[in-house]
Amino acid sequence: MPQVCVDASVVVARLIFDEQRQNAEALWTRWQREQVIPFGPPLLYAEVPSVLRQAVFLGRITLEEGELAFGIFCDMGIAVSERTDLHLAAWEMARVHNQRRLYDCIYLAAAQAEGCDLWTGDRRLVNAVNLPWVRWLGQEVV
């Protein structure tokens, strides 16, 4: 089955009211219809709950909304890359693309290792790396 790598911004956009929520929902619906398996590096399972918790802490969403979103995330069934060498490829990608944050490059490395697209809500990352398989959530998806 085909795969697609998703970063935390795409998942969070689907879970809480966000300007990209409609696009995230449309993508997820398309992937389900086309039997595409969304996956991410293990980092995804730390980053998404952290973003949700921060949204609660800062008052962007209520505690109840945060707990609901966290529960939905836990039930989404996003596959996890089992590769143990992503940090090595990510370090090199950060060097090549002059990125200061390695965690963005871990998602890039996961997608590259599987030979699939990476979907992100981070336009800055898309523009910085300028790779054809790095897709921005804000682009036309339907």
Regions found by a protein language model. Give the residues of each.
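Short, conserved alpha-helical segments within structured domains
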Residues: 41-45, 65, 86-89, 107
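Short glycine/serine- and small hydrophobic-enriched flexible loop segments
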Residues: 50-57, 113
